[in-house]
């Protein structure tokens, strides 16, 4: 017999289903992801820390799980919600079923509910806190715990998911999955310092595949320490939570701007770059989470992978030295920035995909080109 489970939202909505994860109770912000594939990458993406993810695609777990697809060392979500669950996966790469994977990592999850109704609720009312439980099956009691939980707004979660010590990343994209092979070069590798606000492994793989030596540092690393590596470029990673609350990241980025070195930001890193330049951010009603978000400016459109609940206020960029390079074409929110005089740019989406389309992978190539140009103008001291 399946174990009964309960999902309660902060507005009092109640959904009854069955457990496909670990027993217990999980409280977090309930959001939805519209991707048809890549559930393991979603579950292990640090940007989802503190959230309960609803998968809108009705079938989940069909291909099982494999350590190769993890975007971090463990699942980062508080919980998961699905319509139907596959207990017996069918894929040659699978090493563990999704239910067993979640149980091993102590992540509660619920299936058998009307995920379409839940998604429409979030889309209409907005993302809100909720709770999944196999031990509290009284909606009133679970609602009390949900209402006592803090809002995502104002939370600095980057400090929770960041690495504790610096390390060097050397693993490129596996040859079997490489879709844009790089030509071998005799030039020395470029040094990139990646500030880890919750970085995905595939971002680091893409940088390594483009010939970069990648040094990953904690989110609170001072600008002086970062510059002591004499980097050819600085990368601002993705991550969870409210960007305006990541004050150490904003201050560090502001100081690094003075070094005038190439800088590339993705997702939270994009928002921190905007904040460091004097822009403002706001919380989206229900966020952008999926693999088919159109982004562009004029005649060219990229289909992108996105995962964020905050965005830069377009009007606040008027007095900053940047120009908008991309909009999200669904709601016209800012999706890309470029500094007017410095080799600095950022995007609100994920060019590394994993999961998702590869339309924007060229941005890593642009970052590399900027770094090589910088190093030609500023030769490394022998």
Curated annotation (Swiss-Prot):
Superkingdom as given in the UniProt entry: Bacteria
Documented EC number(s): 6.3.5.5
GO molecular function terms attached to this record: ATP binding; carbamoyl-phosphate synthase (glutamine-hydrolyzing) activity; glutaminase activity
Biochemical pathway: Amino-acid biosynthesis; L-arginine biosynthesis; carbamoyl phosphate from bicarbonate: step 1/1; Pyrimidine metabolism; UMP biosynthesis via de novo pathway; (S)-dihydroorotate from bicarbonate: step 1/3
Function according to Swiss-Prot or TrEMBL: Small subunit of the glutamine-dependent carbamoyl phosphate synthetase (CPSase). CPSase catalyzes the formation of carbamoyl phosphate from the ammonia moiety of glutamine, carbonate, and phosphate donated by ATP, constituting the first step of 2 biosynthetic pathways, one leading to arginine and/or urea and the other to pyrimidine nucleotides. The small subunit (glutamine amidotransferase) binds and cleaves glutamine to supply the large subunit with the substrate ammonia.
Subunit text: Composed of two chains; the small (or glutamine) chain promotes the hydrolysis of glutamine to ammonia, which is used by the large (or ammonia) chain to synthesize carbamoyl phosphate. Tetramer of heterodimers (alpha,beta)4.
This protein's name: Carbamoyl phosphate synthase small chain
Organism: Thermosynechococcus vestitus (strain NIES-2133 / IAM M-273 / BP-1)
